[in-house]
Amino acid sequence: MDKERTLVLIKPDGVIRNLVGKILMRFEDAGLKIVGMRMFWADEEFARKHYREELDERYKEVEKKYGRNVRNELVKYLKEGPVVAMVLEGVDGINVVRKMVGSTYPNESAAGTIRGDFAHISKDYANAQNVMVRNLIHASEDKSSADIEISLWFKDDELHSYKTVHDIVCFEN
């Protein structure tokens, strides 16, 4: 299995709740390497590039059920405050990160996942309040999404290769 890179965003609610350090520590403790990181406050145009139009198809069922434009709500949520964007690298990195993050809906996330431990708003509560589920974090869904998202959030020269102790112990003979 090759090392993969994936984009992770700590969304405004995670930043505002001072969870950045705790979340970073979990990824590093799992042997994932931070190869790029920055804090950014997304504007409308940038948020719409992240939540790109081709993702609208995924949200059709939610829109039917709740009568809300999911993409517009996600864009609004991403613009609410600063975001910490990072690129993580590791063996099977995309799947490892997604497993650590947990379900999209915090109340459905297992204990021990980032959302299961730090987020608590259910989709029913969020819908009753007419807000997006505050789920703290975004992680690329697959290799294709990771490639698109990484190139949106980072230039090539902002991503770095280096060895960690984990690399030396686990990957060098």
Question: Where in this protein do the model-derived segments appear?
Answer:
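Non-catalytic terminal and connector segments of soluble metabolic enzymes
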Residues: 1-173
